[in-house]
Amino acid sequence: GGAMRKNEVKSLLETRDAMECLCLRLVCEKNDVAELEKLSPILDSIRDARNADEAAERVFSFHHELAIMSGNVLLPLLYYSFKTQGEYLWSLYCKRSGVKKLYEIKLALFSTLMNKDIDSAIEQTHRIMDVAKNDLGFYGA
């Protein structure tokens, strides 16, 4: 537990940005719309989360499932290695911006994947990570 230092948050965001872009590219290449639809119940669970911590856990599940769908056997392990820190940051974001906003961000990402629009998925990911990196004071001590 406890707050993460700014340099730790920045490093985590940079690493997640790279991992996530690889993951999204592989997911788009290897999965059809029917496979991607399997993410819908996880998205619904994010929308229906009762609090920030619950939403953060469900967002982790969403990204972990994407990592599994990527077909890269290391990506789920890497995501899991950052589980505690990732959930901490998502929870902070939720407490600040609300569950609805976090859900909308993940829904937008899901929509780009369903449309096989990898460029938009990657651009969204870079933009979200950049916003977080520019707000390190909020996320890190």
Over which residues does each language-model region extend?
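Amphipathic alpha-helical packing segments from all-alpha helical-bundle domains
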Residues: 54-58, 73, 77, 96-100
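Short loop-to-helix capping motifs
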Residues: 71-73, 116-117
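All-alpha effector-binding/dimerization core of bacterial HTH-type transcriptional repressors
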Residues: 1-65, 104-127
